From Swiss-Prot:
Principal location: plastid
Protein name stated in the entry: Small ribosomal subunit protein bS16c
Species of origin: Gracilaria tenuistipitata var. liui
Family statement drawn from the similarity comment of this UniProt entry: Belongs to the bacterial ribosomal protein bS16 family.
Keywords, sorted A to Z: Chloroplast, Plastid, Ribonucleoprotein, Ribosomal protein
Matches recorded under Pfam families: Ribosomal_S16 (PF00886)
Domain of life where this protein originates: Eukaryota
């Protein structure tokens, strides 16, 4: 099953995340199928390709709770 979830990168105590599509059995920082966005909790910025998100959800990928919240916030801003 495909999941849309966060992949951590950045420095110590300065997390940033990539929003990725990945097989649910793979590790958090494993190789993604596709990268569809970016999220930085420190300055609360995000950039998401909504077309790709909707395409992947239509194909059966399930977003995690946090990713769903980030997508909702991004849609409200734009």
């Amino acid at each position: 099953m495909l999941k849309i979830r966060l992949k951590r990168f950045g420095r110590k105590r300065q997390p940033s995340y990539r929003i990725i599509v990945i097989d649910s059995r793979k590790p958090r920082d494993g190789r993604p199928i596709e990268e569809i966005g970016f999220y930085s909790p420190l300055n609360n910025k995000s950039k998401i390709n909504l077309i790709q998100v909707k395409k992947r959800i239509y194909q059966g990928a399930q977003p995690t709770k946090k990713v769903q919240q980030i997508i909702s916030q991004f849609e409200k801003q734009n």
